[in-house]
A protein has these predicted regions:
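Charged catalytic cores and adjacent phosphate/nucleic-acid-binding surfaces used
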Residues: 76-93, 97-179
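Extended substrate/RNA-proximal surfaces in nucleic-acid metabolism proteins
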Residues: 1-118, 176
Length: 179
């Protein structure tokens, strides 16, 4: 790893955000194999790219970014898709559920996360200008359900540029409004 395990006394965790790519809850690169190393050295056996990458991480955030493959799926199917993603041992967090635009059973999924010791992410990008009010309201419902059922959350900026790192003011405000 490029970063040390600790830096100025703070333990650094290495993570990756990975797309859920189908209704079975599989993560990106679950089906991509390779059998050569970086220097064209032949490996003893083929490796699965997704497992190889996630094996170097402390955790993964499983998220939806493209949902065309879920067109016509039922609420039950979408809920099960997320549950299946949680079966991946690398997945610790389900990412930005409020803006996925997919209909799932919020209490059922929150209970599943709670019971498995997994987290649900809330991030600032969902609150950015141009995001639909429905996504922000959906985040509120998810956060309230997490509070009611005792599911832990993670929150952050979802920064895609250095100037946005640690900017989570709208998420913090929304969470503070939930008692």
């Amino acid at each position: 790893a490029i970063w040390p395990e600790t830096w100025y006394g703070v333990r650094l965790l290495h993570g990756a955000e990975v797309d859920i790519v189908d209704l079975e809850g599989n993560l990106f690169a679950y089906d991509i194999t390779f059998d050569q190393g970086i220097n064209d050295d032949k490996l003893h056996q083929p490796h699965i790219l997704g497992e190889h990458i996630l094996g170097t991480c402390d955790y993964a955030v499983a998220s939806i970014h493209s949902k065309q493959w879920a067109a016509g799926a039922s609420q039950k199917q979408i809920t099960q898709m997320y549950v299946n993603a949680l079966d991946n041992p690398h997945v610790l967090i389900l990412g930005h559920l409020g803006r996925s635009g997919l209909d799932f059973d919020v209490p059922a999924l929150v209970r599943e996360c709670r019971d498995r010791g997994k987290l649900i992410e809330m991030n600032e990008a969902t609150h950015d200008e141009g995001q639909r009010e429905v996504a922000i309201e959906r985040c509120r419902v998810i956060a309230e359900t997490c509070a009611e059922l005792g599911c832990k959350i993670s929150f952050g900026s979802d920064a895609h540029i250095a100037t946005r790192i640690a900017d989570a003011h709208s998420v913090i405000k929304q969470l503070e409004e939930i008692d």
